[in-house]
């Protein structure tokens, strides 16, 4: 269920603030969102996979924390990111 190197590089290039940027909140949220979307497809087939569901909830929580941090630091970047990712809120 993890991302390939090509997928990761594509997301980093699209959401990175500068070249080789892997630590900015935008990149981290985009990577988590991609992983979350992949796992949601997994749960359509495997409804009783509770172990993986715990990992999904952990990722959702981490994404929420990063979004809250970004909203507090720079609301404009936050609004741009949630619009680009198609997230609610």
UniProtKB/Swiss-Prot annotation:
Gene3D superfamilies in the cross-refs: 6.10.250.3130, S15/NS1, RNA-binding (1.10.287.10)
Alphabetical list of InterPro entries matching this protein: Ribosomal_uS15, Ribosomal_uS15_bac-type, uS15_NS1_RNA-bd_sf
Source species, domain of life: Bacteria
SMART domains attached to this UniProt entry: Ribosomal_S15
CDD domains with a match to the protein in the record: Ribosomal_S15p_S13e (cd00353)
Record keywords: Ribonucleoprotein, Ribosomal protein, RNA-binding, rRNA-binding
GO biological processes: translation
One Gene Ontology cellular component: cytosolic small ribosomal subunit
Gene Ontology MF annotations: rRNA binding; structural constituent of ribosome
The keyword Ribosomal protein belongs to this UniProt entry's keyword annotation: yes
Role summary: One of the primary rRNA binding proteins, it binds directly to 16S rRNA where it helps nucleate assembly of the platform of the 30S subunit by binding and bridging several RNA helices of the 16S rRNA. Forms an intersubunit bridge (bridge B4) with the 23S rRNA of the 50S subunit in the ribosome.
Subunit composition and interactions: Part of the 30S ribosomal subunit. Forms a bridge to the 50S subunit in the 70S ribosome, contacting the 23S rRNA.
Similarity-based family: Belongs to the universal ribosomal protein uS15 family.
Protein name: Small ribosomal subunit protein uS15
Organism: Alteromonas mediterranea (strain DSM 17117 / CIP 110805 / LMG 28347 / Deep ecotype)
């Amino acid at each position: 269920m993890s991302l390939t190197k090509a997928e990761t590089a594509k997301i980093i290039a699209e959401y990175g603030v500068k070249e080789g940027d892997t630590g900015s909140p935008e990149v981290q949220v985009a990577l988590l969102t991609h992983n979350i979307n992949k796992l949601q497809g997994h749960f359509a087939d495997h409804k009783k996979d509770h172990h993986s569901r715990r990992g999904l909830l952990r990722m959702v929580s981490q994404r929420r924390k990063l979004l809250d941090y970004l909203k507090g630091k720079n609301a404009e970047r936050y609004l741009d990111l949630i619009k680009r990712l198609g997230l609610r809120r």
